[in-house]
Design a protein with these regions (language model features):
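Aromatic-lined glycan-binding groove of carbohydrate-active enzymes
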Residues: 185-191, 196, 211-219, 223, ...
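Hydrophobic faces of well-ordered beta-strands that scaffold small-molecule active sites
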Residues: 8-12, 44-46, 76-78, 106-110, ...
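Glycine-rich, proline-tolerant flexible connector loops at the mouths of alpha/beta enzymes
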Residues: 43-67, 82, 114, 201-208, ...
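Conserved, mostly hydrophobic/aromatic
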Residues: 8, 36, 40, 48, ...
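N-terminal beta1-alpha1-beta2 module of alpha/beta enzyme domains
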Residues: 1-76, 173-174, 354-356, 369, ...
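A short, acidic, amphipathic alpha-helical segment used as a generic capping/interface helix at domain edges
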Residues: 292-308
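Active-site mouth loops of central-metabolism enzymes
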Residues: 12-27, 81-89, 170-182, 243, ...
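Internal, glycine-rich beta/alpha segment that forms the wall or movable "lid"
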Residues: 2-6, 87-195, 209-212, 216, ...
């Protein structure tokens, strides 16, 4: 189906609770991407982490390479590549190779690195991460143009007359997006080059209210650098779980969400515990979480779009295992069946067609009743009583006597 309107996908860190078999956890991640591809989701962004136990994928490139062989249409991105941890020439080379191997289905997500413990083990002071990311991103953008030999020298990498010997498969290059939280850094980095944005901060307290002002930072920065921002390349990342009704969805995720938040974010990463007695329900009200029925999901996404001050191009669901495997897979199916068509326009022509036939039924269908009647009477047979009432259009036509 040709894509119109909003795009949907997942932001797959991934999150897997401690004590589980990590081999099976990664297998489930790939299974999920296959399922999303079959359901018609647009994108899957896969994370890079190196410590703290829960987020087990160290190389999104390796996961993308395997997922590409098991899927047909879904776009596959790094969500995100921690640029300060890698030489920019090698990042550019790897993603150009993936661009060819996937025939244009790869995307590069960029960030400074999410876990301080990763940077600590690599001997990088957190205060240098954002500067390093900017330097790396500048180098990658120049390399991907393939129109010059790039010489750069920083305190952590050097390039001497560097030029990619393999140009991107995509024209002019694959899509690049920058992760943005509640600080202005990500929007500034994206604005400097006119890149896409992954607003992870939309799922944090205070995030939705700040979205419009954050986007303005990107637009203002782009104008200063002769670039242009496009809202179609802006994706909002939120938690999601869908069931047949709101209370069922809330029940299914309550224990799993509490375990993830308490065990990982509070006890392991040191985030200050929240004060809400029902954080998921309150998150739905605050637009930081989409948990409920398909109808609730539509309302929350529409409110998020309004809060953004002009709309955005897509919604990514922060993949989690708050519910059981079966409930989680069903959640993605329900969203694909009942929410995606609303925002992508797939259901509108069908609804309009049904409404037109309903409104014009007497005029359009009445001749069919006569045609069916004559199919019997013209051969000298009586019209069966059942046909007089079951024929399409019979509701609006008085039964006629047989000729």
């Amino acid at each position: 189906m040709a894509r119109r309107g909003m795009k949907f996908g997942i932001f797959l860190a991934p999150f897997h609770r401690l004590g589980e078999n990590p081999t099976l956890a990664m297998a489930r991640d790939l299974e999920l991407i296959e399922w999303l591809d079959w359901l018609g989701y647009d994108e899957a962004w896969i994370g890079e982490h190196h410590s703290a136990g829960w987020e087990v994928i160290a190389s999104p490139e390796l996961a993308i390479a395997q997922a590409a062989e098991r899927t047909r249409n879904i776009m596959l991105g790094s969500g995100v590549t921690s640029l300060p941890y890698h030489h920019p020439f090698l990042v550019a080379q790897r993603f150009v190779q993936l661009d060819h191997m996937t025939r244009g289905r790869v995307m590069l997500g960029c960030g400074p690195g999410a876990l301080p413990s990763d940077a600590y083990m690599l001997g990088i002071e957190p205060v240098h991460l954002r500067r390093r990311m900017e330097e790396s991103l500048d180098a990658i953008i120049r390399l991907l143009r393939c129109d010059e030999r790039v010489t750069m020298s920083t305190d952590w990498f050097e390039m001497r007359e560097a030029k990619l010997h393999l140009a991107p498969y995509s024209d002019p290059r694959f899509h690049i997006a920058v992760a943005s939280t509640i600080t202005p850094f990500g929007m500034v980095a994206a604005g400097r080059h006119g890149l896409g944005v992954l607003s992870i901060g939309a799922g944090l307290p205070g995030g939705p209210e700040a979205m419009a002002s954050q986007w303005k930072i990107a637009e203002d920065t782009a104008a200063q650098h002769g670039a242009t921002m496009n809202r179609k390349d802006w994706r909002i990342v939120v938690g999601m779980h869908i069931a047949e009704d709101d209370e069922k969805a809330l029940r299914q995720v309550k224990a799993g969400e509490r375990h993830e938040t308490t065990s990982y974010f509070e006890e392991t990463l040191g985030r200050v515990p929240g004060t809400s007695d029902d954080p998921v329900r309150d998150g739905v009200k605050a637009l930081t979480t989409v948990v409920g029925s398909p109808e609730t999901a539509i309302r929350v996404i529409e409110r998020l779009s309004a809060a953004s001050g002009g709309g955005f191009g897509g919604v990514l669901f922060r993949a989690h295992e708050w519910a059981t495997r079966e409930q989680t897979m069903k959640s993605y199916e329900l969203f694909a069946r009942y929410v995606m068509p609303y925002f992508q326009g797939a259901a509108a022509p069908l609804i309009e067609s049904a409404a037109w036939v309903r409104e014009n039924r007497r005029r359009v269908m009445s001749n069919n009743v006569e045609a069916v009647r004559r199919a019997f009477t013209d051969t000298g047979r009586s019209v069966p009583d059942e046909m007089k009432y079951r024929t399409v259009g019979a509701q609006d036509v008085e039964p006629a006597a047989d000729d």
